Design a protein with these regions (language model features):
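Short S/T/G/P-rich N-terminal loop/turn motif that feeds into the first structured element of a domain
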Residues: 1-35, 39-51, 62-67, 88-110
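A structural signal for short, well-ordered beta-strand segments
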Residues: 6-8, 55, 82-84
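Short cationic amphipathic helices and targeting signals
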Residues: 52-58
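An amphipathic, aromatic/His-enriched active-site/gating alpha helix that lines ligand/cofactor pockets
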Residues: 58-90
């Protein structure tokens, strides 16, 4: 599983529609993620930030994540901008530190 944090900014039209309708975007997001084996872990609005929303989700692989991004962001039309960050569990980072000694590398020199 991969864990992703996605921050996104709605278009002005989408923000207006959400506030006027009271639409539950969290449920809409779940409907895209869950059929692909993913899980919405958290969803937050962000006040005073460039981005309007932030969500943390898990996916079986990057393929399913990219499919959701393509459908919801590139094809959806309601998102003006976004930033994706892959979250790495600290256990994975610790495991990587144990492998470092096995890697051959020579840094460039002047």
């Amino acid at each position: 599983m991969i864990t992703m944090m996605l921050k996104f900014k709605y278009t002005p039209e989408a923000m207006k529609a959400i506030f006027l309708s009271g639409d539950d975007r969290k449920e809409a997001i779940k409907k895209m993620i869950e059929p692909l084996g993913g899980k919405l872990i958290a969803s937050y609005g962000m006040q005073g930030q460039y981005y309007h929303m932030m969500m943390i989700s898990e996916f079986p692989s990057m393929t399913e994540y990219l499919a959701v991004v393509a459908k919801g962001i590139f094809l959806g039309g309601a998102i003006a901008d976004y930033k994706a960050i892959q979250l790495i569990p600290t256990e994975t980072m610790q495991a990587a530190s144990k492998v470092i000694g096995d890697i051959e590398y020579t840094a460039p020199s002047n």
